[in-house]
Amino acid sequence: MFKEQETRMITVFGEGAVKVSPSTVHVVLSVVSRGTELGEIQQENARRMNQVIQSLQKAGVAEASIQTTDFQIRPVYDYVNGEQRFQGYEVINSIRMTSDELSRTGEFVDLAVKNGANQIGSIEFTMPNSDKHYQRALVLALQDAETKMITIGTSLKLQNRPIPLKIEEQHTSQPVAFRAVAMADTGKTPIESGTMTIRASLQVKYQIV
């Protein structure tokens, strides 16, 4: 009686990584104002934010590279002996600045703070062509899996080379390159873009024949 031969499988994981330098920086800058007279703090907040924007534009940041991302007006309360007491209002105005002059990031931050910004929301370095680098990492991951399979096959003294039957992409989070250090003796804020590592991971199932 014919008996179907059981399929023998080996699963290996391959990983690939590509290091690249980011090309764009995004900085979120905010002006936060507090007071009891809403009209006054709105005007003060607007004046300071306009000053921040104008200073960045004078430094070479294009108008199209500065975008308002958030504007809030909210009441501020304090709690004394379990009782809620009105303290005033808080106005928050945030912008997102984009630049390809990564070496000037610290300069832009210092300039914004000098002209009225009092909160730095985030500093993010990115690449416009990250998909291209990820494809390279995938190729390296597949090569890594193949190398591992050859090593396993040699160790097991397999007569035939295993056949890849299924390749599954494993999702991995991509880190954002950002490195900042404390204020230097020069009084400037040093911010370094560093490098970004694009990673890819694959699960490959091989059939042993």
Question: Language-model segments: which ranges?
Answer:
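Short, charge-dense linear interaction motifs
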Residues: 1-115, 119-209
